[in-house]
Amino acid sequence: MKVRASVKKRCEHCKLIKRKGRVMVVCSKNPRHNQRQG
């Protein structure tokens, strides 16, 4: 899980979601794409 100022979808499998008020990118195909806005 990378923490970034700006999160973007990196492939077509990435999903933008909101958990506990934080914007996150979760990817089912490639877990390296997981990001959290910090």
From Swiss-Prot:
Does the keyword Ribonucleoprotein belong to this entry? yes
One Gene Ontology term of the biological-process aspect is: translation
Assigned keywords, A-Z:
Ribonucleoprotein, Ribosomal protein
GO-annotated molecular function: structural constituent of ribosome
Q: Name one GO cellular component term.
A: ribonucleoprotein complex
Entry's PANTHER family? 50S RIBOSOMAL PROTEIN L36, CHLOROPLASTIC, LARGE RIBOSOMAL SUBUNIT PROTEIN BL36C
Which family does the similarity line name?
Belongs to the bacterial ribosomal protein bL36 family.
Q: What name does the UniProt record give this protein?
A: Large ribosomal subunit protein bL36
Q: Which organism is this entry from?
A: Kosmotoga olearia (strain ATCC BAA-1733 / DSM 21960 / TBF 19.5.1)
